[in-house]
Amino acid sequence: MAGNKSSDFSHLPLATNKAMECALTGSELLSCTYLNKGSAFTEEERDEFELVGLLPSNVQTLDEQVKRAYAQFSTRPDNLAKNTFMTSLKEQNEVLYYRLIQDHLKEMFPIIYTPTEGEAISKYSSLFRRPEGCFLNVNEPEKVEQSMSQWGGPDDIDLIVVSDGEQILGIGDQGVGGILISIAKLAIYTLCAGIHPHRTLPVVLDTGTNNEDFLKDDIYLGLRQERVRGEKYDKLVDTFVKTARKQYPNAYIHFEDFGLPNARRILDEYTPKIACFNDDVQGTGCVTLA
């Protein structure tokens, strides 16, 4: 149903059979990855939301869309191409993206996460099409608050996954490509824990890279400088944590794929102060002991 509310989806349930108010119409609605239903918009919705002429005539169910999307997925020649297809699908229609994975979780988990996501991360700059997530620059700590303020108010974010990209999935320093591990981990939270994707925030701390290939690569999208250590690094981490606590006080912070010395040190520093978790230290430890 049409309405006058802004497109703030933070408090929507993960799934609903009820009508939702939406102020978007026409091409703007089709460009909204969360609300776009593609060929599943009914005749009534096409009239109400000014979509007539913007979609093929046949109205399809979500099940029919899933069938087509799975066929498209299956024709991709290799796992990286399948990963890229899934990323593209997510950028167009999130409901279809999550439903497709849910129906084929065992097959697609290795595509959207390890091991295939590692290859996608290593090629982040060459495969880049559009940004997703929050990018924090170690040389601009004064802009952290502005950067993190764009995802809603104090009650809008439940979970933040943050990485500095130094030790990604066993493949080492991936620099700014670390944003993809934050995104992938949050997709797993949605699929396996039911956390609404629009109540999460993926973050990368761009502190440079010691990956020589990236430092020499003109198309690398992150800071082309050696990794920052010491006080300047700690200032960015601390500014991020304090800003997250200020802007999203109910959010749980998940530290992901930091280099081991920093991972342990950061966890020890902030565990007494905030709700936080490091998967590589605590998650791996728990699984090993189990």
Question: Which residue stretches match the model-derived regions?
Answer:
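Metallocofactor- and cofactor-centric catalytic cores in central/energy metabolism, strongly enriched
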Residues: 2-290
